Amino acid sequence: MRKYIAIIIASLALFTGQAHAQRCLPKMQGIEIRANMADGFNPGGNNGGYSFGAALSTYTKKGNKWMFGGEYLLKNNPYKDGKIPVAQFTAEGGYYFKILSDARKIVFVYAGASALAGYESVNWGEKVLHDGSTLHDRDAFIYGGALTLDVEFYVADRIALLANLRERLLWGGDTRKFHTQFGAGVKIIIN
């Protein structure tokens, strides 16, 4: 009898499947914090740009997700020996489709589209430049959208590292309409 029980226990131990993490379940929510470079990699130069953002993502069926958040983008435009800053403050709402994931649910790749609306400030509202020139671009409300390719890499059950590539298209302002962004971030699952 002992031999029979030992064989059953050994077979159960050997033939059981692995348990996988339960990630991206419907109604799970996470807070994302991101940092991006905008329009190329030019840190500290007269033509550099960067953005910071935070968002709340809520997962739906099949691992897709809704995303709602805000972002601050600063793009410096070269002017003679200086620069003219253009800042954008935007709110975002969008839907992302899961296009790829591994079997162990560690890496997820998403493609999504978002609607954006916000405010653009050119040279922080100052019309006269440092050399006495007058700036004709004005502050304005902006609106548009973004296409995003997003990768999540889970390092723990509730913590994921993020990488993203996105293209923003915004109307209403006097400056550039397109902004390409790439960057990294972290996501913390809150429920």
Task: Name each model-derived stretch.
Residues 1-28:
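Cleavable N-terminal export/targeting peptides
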Residues 3, 25-29, 62-64, 101-107, ...:
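Short coil turns and loop connectors of transmembrane beta-barrels in diderm outer membranes
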Residues 20-75, 187-191:
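Short glycine/proline- and aromatic-enriched beta-strand/turn motifs that initiate or cap beta-hairpins
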Residues 27-31, 46-52, 83-91, 107, ...:
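Residues that define the transmembrane beta-barrel architecture of outer-membrane proteins
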Residues 39-42, 77-84, 131-137, 169-173:
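Extracellular loop and loop/strand-boundary signature of outer-membrane beta-barrel proteins
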Residues 55-130, 188-191:
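Gram-negative (and chloroplast) outer-membrane scaffold detector with strong preference
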Residues 73-75, 150-191:
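Predominantly the C-terminal beta-signal and adjacent terminal strand-loop region
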Residues 124-165, 188:
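Extended low-complexity acidic/polar segments
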